[in-house]
Amino acid sequence: LPMEPSGSLPVLAIGGWGADGVSQAASTADGRARFVDSTLVLMERHGFLGVDIDWEYPGTSAGGIKSRAEDVENWYALLSLLRDGLDKRTAATGQKHTLSVAVGAGDSLLKPIDPARLNALADQVVVMAYDLCGFDRETGHHAALYPDDNSRQSGARAVRTLKQGGLSADKILLGIPAYGRMWRQVSGRAVTQTAGISGTKGLNFPD
């Protein structure tokens, strides 16, 4: 929640890893309208001037959430309706009401996204440039800024993909993690990426 004394806007964040229910809410016109209406009411009640939508992820059941094939199109429809509502609030109050959207940085998560379409809807796009690995059987940097010979995925690659697809560079925010990944029972003695492992574990950095 950014605070006003710093010059930033208080933003309502909706979603996150394992936050279920968005696919269901966005699947019908009535559900989308109710989602947007309740969001705008909550924003007005608590003085929020922006909303961040963090659906992880449209079209996938990652995190144990429900999903459907139409999720991506429903996501755009939801964002479009929310954009209209925020613009009306801006016109009515004279205060800018912003929409930010979080997207994954991995190739498979970026593939269904149309950056130009997103550019027309969002004020900011937060690229979650982390968890690029850590869910398979090989070691790797889970938040690599640049790719190397062992791994193509990186924050820079995600940003380039979005820019080339039509998303304005000034709308992109690069998300970085405050945690690391540990590897258990790494095969061999060489400390390299892509070494075999038996499992992974997250490690939070203290404040």
Predicted regions and their residues:
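Glycan-recognition patch characteristic of GH18 chitinases/ENGases
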Residues: 1-44, 70
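Conserved beta-strand positions in the central sheet of alpha/beta enzyme cores
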Residues: 11-13, 47, 52-54, 126, ...
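Short loop/turn segments at strand-loop or loop-helix junctions that form parts
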Residues: 14-17, 55-58, 129
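Substrate-binding surface in catalytic domains of secreted glycosidases
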Residues: 58-207
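Serine-hydrolase-like catalytic core of hydrolytic proteins
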Residues: 35, 39-43, 50-52, 56-57, ...
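Gly/Ser/Thr-rich helix-start
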Residues: 16-17, 51, 141, 181
